């Protein structure tokens, strides 16, 4: 068995390049590993929570495994076996298929109309004609959770603030309870789950979500069955049809995976709830950094405003205007490259991963490029944050360049915001490429466009621009810098 040169003895023990695994030195340890091993085409290992191991590959050498079939290597298994997710939510194939379904233009434009309508009705109550300092993270959270409830579940949930709070409690808790479990041996998890107040609170919240949603799920099943009996084309679509929850139910019905028992419906309910983790979780901080980047770099505001205005022209917000905004698409790709370098995981604020293209081996695999045998149960990943900030790939990589991917000669983007490459891994790569990337990027661009056209924003130059620092293995858990922004309504806004 030939292994990476970083590991001279047994498979892991003795091959573990230690450094700091927690605390302030963690990011420097990863950076050192990147230049000592990744840049030299070598693999290095890190010991993570619960004595698990991760092998960190150079991106170009992940080709051998990132497209392997799910029975050999799986992102979902990495996500669910990494902690306790599988104990409250079982994700099915239908779950991912719905995310892909909402990447279709017809549904994107239907969602876009909802986004603009709800955003324009909510923000005037917060933002007036005078400059006001707001906690932008909180504004984005409040806005996105409302949109999250409306688009994922339906209009009846859009103004239910208790429901919104419970959704956020769930989304934060998915990683929050894992962080607690990871501080204890796996053998003690059952006891910890019984006595720790955070874990008890997380699970105590679930019955409330189910009580709110299960009657609605049963009602939607009955309506979908009635539509099927009448012929779907004869029944007008309702507002609740343009929701992830209805689409998920319909997908399960079509695939014959929708059981009739209460326990089966509860599983569908938790799958639907989990969409909040995947919607509010990454969309909220991405929108936050988009607006903060505009506030810090006011030169972009006018250029983006002119582009969006031209794209809208005589059309309204329901038009496919994003097809004509290459500068805005370049802008979001740069935000995703620099400020949101990998999959976002949520805690009290949020977390940003140091690595992506995360997989867990289901069976022993062989990596031909490294002549390397890897046993089952090992986590594999790529150091995305450091690739994204490598000057060999991006000139002046730590400097924000909103039009880095815009070509003024052709007036087009050089690469789409959601396209993965070996040096751009915000949405992972290979078979685990984020199925919701097109939908998520579209939502953020629409919301950002509304802000650009309706509001002026600026950042106090005396305050430190926000960033995320990692102090726990594989995750960032601390926001540094300001989350405040100055904002006011434009006097000549486009409604």
Swiss-Prot record:
Enzyme nomenclature, EC number: 1.-.-.-
Cofactor: heme
InterPro entries: Cyt_P450, Cyt_P450_E_grp-IV, Cyt_P450_sf
GO MF annotation, one: heme binding
Residues that hold heme according to the record: 434
Superkingdom in the source lineage: Eukaryota
Alphabetic keyword roster: Heme, Iron, Metal-binding, Monooxygenase, NADP, Oxidoreductase
GO annotation, biological process: mycotoxin biosynthetic process
UniProt-listed Pfam families: p450
Observed phenotype of the null mutant: Abolishes the biosynthesis of communesins A and B and leads to the accumulation of aurantioclavine.
CDD domains for this protein: CYP503A1-like
PANTHER family referenced in this protein's UniProt entry, alphabetically: CYTOCHROME P450
Protein role: Cytochrome P450 monooxygenase; part of the gene cluster that mediates the biosynthesis of communesins, a prominent class of indole alkaloids with great potential as pharmaceuticals. Communesins are biosynthesized by the coupling of tryptamine and aurantioclavine, two building blocks derived from L-tryptophan.
Protein name, entry field: Cytochrome P450 monooxygenase cnsC
Annotated source species: Penicillium expansum (Blue mold rot fungus)
Species classification: Eukaryota, Fungi, Dikarya, Ascomycota, Pezizomycotina
């Amino acid at each position: 068995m030939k292994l990476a040169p970083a590991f001279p003895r047994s498979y892991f023990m003795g091959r573990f390049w230690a450094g700091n695994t927690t605390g302030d030195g963690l990011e420097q340890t990863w950076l050192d590993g990147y230049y000592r091993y990744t840049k030299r085409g070598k693999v290095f290992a890190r010991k993570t929570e619960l004595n698990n191991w991760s092998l960190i590959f150079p991106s170009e050498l992940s080709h051998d495994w990132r497209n392997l079939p799910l029975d050999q290597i799986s992102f979902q298994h990495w996500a669910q076996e990494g902690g306790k997710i599988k104990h409250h939510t079982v994700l099915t194939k239908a779950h991912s298929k719905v995310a892909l379904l909402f990447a279709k233009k017809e549904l994107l434009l239907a969602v876009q109309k909802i986004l603009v309508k709800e955003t324009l009705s909510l923000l005037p109550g917060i933002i007036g004609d005078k400059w006001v300092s707001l906690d932008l993270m909180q504004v984005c959270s409040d806005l996105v959770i409302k949109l999250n409830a409306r688009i994922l579940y339906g209009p009846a949930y859009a103004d239910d603030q208790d429901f919104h709070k419970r959704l956020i409690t769930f989304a934060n808790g998915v990683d929050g309870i894992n962080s607690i479990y990871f501080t204890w041996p796996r053998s003690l998890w059952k006891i910890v789950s019984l006595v720790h107040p955070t874990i008890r609170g997380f699970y105590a919240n679930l019955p409330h979500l189910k009580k709110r949603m299960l009657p609605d799920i049963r009602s939607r099943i009955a309506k979908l069955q009635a539509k099927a009996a009448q012929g779907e084309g004869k029944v007008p679509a309702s507002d609740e049809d343009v929701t992830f929850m209805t689409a998920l139910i319909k997908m399960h019905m079509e695939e014959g995976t929708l059981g009739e028992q209460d326990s089966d419906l509860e599983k569908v309910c938790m799958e639907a709830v989990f969409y909040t983790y995947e919607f509010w979780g990454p969309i909220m901080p991405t929108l936050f950094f988009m607006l903060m980047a505009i506030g810090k770099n006011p030169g972009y505001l006018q250029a983006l405003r002119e582009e969006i205005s031209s794209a809208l022209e005589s059309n309204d917000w329901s038009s496919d205007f994003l097809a004509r905004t290459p500068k805005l698409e370049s802008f979001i790709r740069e935000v995703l490259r620099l400020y949101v370098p990998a999959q976002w995981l949520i805690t009290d604020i949020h977390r940003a991963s140091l690595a992506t293209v995360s997989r867990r081996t289901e069976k022993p695999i062989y990596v031909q490029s490294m002549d390397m045998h890897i046993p089952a149960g090992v986590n594999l990943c790529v150091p995305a944050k450091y690739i994204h900030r490598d000057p060999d790939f991006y000139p002046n990589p730590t400097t924000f360049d909103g039009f880095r991917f815009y070509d003024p000669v052709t007036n087009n983007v050089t690469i789409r915001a959601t396209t993965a490459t070996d040096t751009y891994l915000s949405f992972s790569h290979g078979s685990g490429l984020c199925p919701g990337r097109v939908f998520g990027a579209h939502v953020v661009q629409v919301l950002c466009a509304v802000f650009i056209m309706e509001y002026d924003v600026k950042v106090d130059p005396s305050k430190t621009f926000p960033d995320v620092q990692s102090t726990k293995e594989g995750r960032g858990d601390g926001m540094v810098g300001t989350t405040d922004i100055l904002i006011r309504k434009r006097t000549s806004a486009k409604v």
